[in-house]
């Protein structure tokens, strides 16, 4: 039996999962941490805390492994590291961190985002690494001239363990656009970016400071002696384990829900929420509010991403007694449209609706029935409403979804948020029994796939990054998820009609915000492009 380790740096928790080559969980560990808000609207974490958290999560996993009477972990067969995508982590040629880590949550790069989107003819959201980099170029950041290496949080942790400057294709696509045909950074856009930076006297070329992009199934490096001691300071862990290319939380969500093929959509709902649909063909036009990212094997996906999901709910649950399950189930007693109660959960800016700053609030429309059930239902609705607004923008593309799977903390109470999501999307939604393991488990599966592919290549049967005779899709379907159980909920007519009415009220409140905060010139939401269903569900 192999031992495969997956580690994921989430927004509020660092998780570690140990499983075998078929994805069966052997042990788990975790560590809680929080971001800090610095001056200038910058959200950040200390890298020292990331290392401490990784060590603590692994130590807890070791204790869990021993508790299950499986002994000590002397060696691992494969490891995978994942984390929050995007952000800004620059280093000089000596590996010295040049500036504070700027996370995906920062909405301080609007000028760079707009300029690059126009120059590339491709949406560059504010949270993307290249937007952060170019904003620092525009601002004349002192560190810019000394940058020798730019990476993500997962890329940084992977580098500490292996000494390799690499990323998986999906994680790389959150730094700089990736060409699905070449499975590498887009060559034309690289040249365009270099030309823009040359005007500002930047001494480097963008490709030279980006990590190398690798496909799922390729080897991302091996655990060094130094890396083994860093991960397990007790000295019990041997070096030598194979590491998969580090991936983003979006991609590990795809893998954890077995949604990696065309027409399949994964919804991940935790601190943030995103719905990611794998595209059969490129979108016909550019949508500034929609990310185009890539799967671990390079296929394009359209993503509607909202910065805030469960954080606002967490605050209210704490105030109302702390019993998540009871409050979530109480929401089922609320009116399908929440009876005029509306919550806005924005604890940070939300680019989809063109809001740059945080403004959580509760609103009651005239005649509203302000009950706890309606309030909780409104809070859960609002956690997915912004994502739905984004999906509505691409309604004209005629996306056909063959399946929708969901995972994340929002769905821990069975059949509550899952039903609301089905009503919101107008499509059946499945929660797999395995999806509760989360992104760390998804990353472990990618590591297992990399080890499997490497083994087949050694036997002379391989075909490179596509998995040596088994694609990632085949591996997941035939090895990991074969016979997997899940619960599927179909849209409820009353619920779907109620959510549609709630979304109208939600947008009505958003449009009133500029006058509330004294910024009448501010335009939230933009043109009224909302349609009832953002995607078509193919039931054939």
Where are these regions (language model features)?
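N-terminal glycine/serine-rich phosphate-binding loop of ATP-dependent small-molecule kinases
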Residues: 1-100, 114-115, 146, 207, ...
